[in-house]
Regions:
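Conserved ABC ATPase signature
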Residues: 132-136, 140
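ABC ATPase nucleotide-binding domains
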Residues: 230, 236-258
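Helix-to-loop junction immediately C-terminal to a conserved catalytic motif
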Residues: 48
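Conserved structural motif at the start of ABC-family nucleotide-binding domains
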Residues: 2, 17-19
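Conserved ABC ATPase "signature" region
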Residues: 111-128, 150
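Conserved ABC transporter NBD signature motif
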Residues: 55-66
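The feature captures the beta-strand-to-loop junction immediately N-terminal to the Walker
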Residues: 33-35
Length: 258
């Protein structure tokens, strides 16, 4: 699905990423974790082909991003970013409809409206679809933009790819789990998701694989139970922790400060 080799990036002579190799498979939910400044968001932007890097090409569905038709690519790939404008003079539904722009010229089709309503239901924003976007709280705006990204990929294309940079910021526990269940359902249909998260326990619960970063390098990339060990996590985060099994789902449960 996605292959990247020897990704390196520097800014003003400061190394941000160093020789990163990543392969993501069809139907996989990969979660990128690591301390602040590890390079998580930069790596995500690189993988999404939003930033220039060294000459090594990134392969998506056996083609480089440069070889893709730029009108076709948005039907296969979408990205949710951390920074979204706080001043958008549109209704909530109009903001979500922006995700359908690759599908129509000036007037949305009924299929576009249906896709928007479906994504809004998944992110629990239907109730304020006619409200001014600027009147929403931070968490509500976050869910609106998640709906916008999801509706972009609402189509019959096989093996789609979504990138999400800290999609759970400002969300309460209910909506954190609701969003991750939606993403998990997306990958269970043969699609792929690459997500940056800070909550290690949510990563352990939902991820098929975890990529742990520190200072621009990969520390470990494996199944959650292989990455989330006391030795690895305590060292990378420079903070003591205990790892036990979650009694409900048997995933690793990280308890910091112990």
């Amino acid at each position: 699905m996605l292959e990247a080799c020897k990704i390196s990036y520097s800014h003003k002579k400061v190394s941000i990423l160093e020789n990163i190799d990543v392969t993501v498979n069809y139907g996989e939910l990969l979660v990128i974790v690591g301390p602040n400044g590890a390079g998580k968001s930069t790596l995500l932007s690189m993988l999404a082909n939003e930033m220039k890097h060294n000459d090594e090409p990134i392969i998506f569905k056996k083609k480089t991003f440069e070889d893709w038709d730029q009108k076709e690519l948005p039907l296969h790939k979408a990205k949710f970013s951390q920074q979204n404008s706080s001043d958008i003079p549109l209704t909530v539904m109009d903001v979500v409809m922006m995700g359908r722009y690759p599908y129509f010229n000036s007037i949305p089709h009924q299929s576009d409206i249906d896709a928007v309503l479906k994504s809004m239901a998944e992110t629990d924003v239907v109730a304020f679809k006619d409200r001014d976007y600027n009147t929403l709280s931070g968490g509500e705006r976050q869910r609106v933009h998640l709906a916008r990204v999801l509706t972009q990929l609402e189509n019959d294309v096989a093996h789609k790819l979504v990138f999400m940079d800290e999609p759970l910021n400002n969300l309460d526990v209910l909506h954190q789990h609701r969003i991750l269940h939606t993403v998990k359902n997306f990958t269970e249909r043969g699609n792929t998701a690459v997500i940056v998260l800070h909550d290690l326990n949510l990563a352990a619960q939902f991820a098929d694989s975890v990529l742990l970063m520190q200072k621009g390098k990969i520390v470990n990339h494996d199944k959650p139970e292989k990455v989330f060990t006391k030795e690895i996590i305590s060292k990378v985060y420079n903070f003591p922790c205990t790892i036990c099994l979650n009694p409900v789902n048997q995933n690793p449960l990280i308890i910091f400060g112990t």
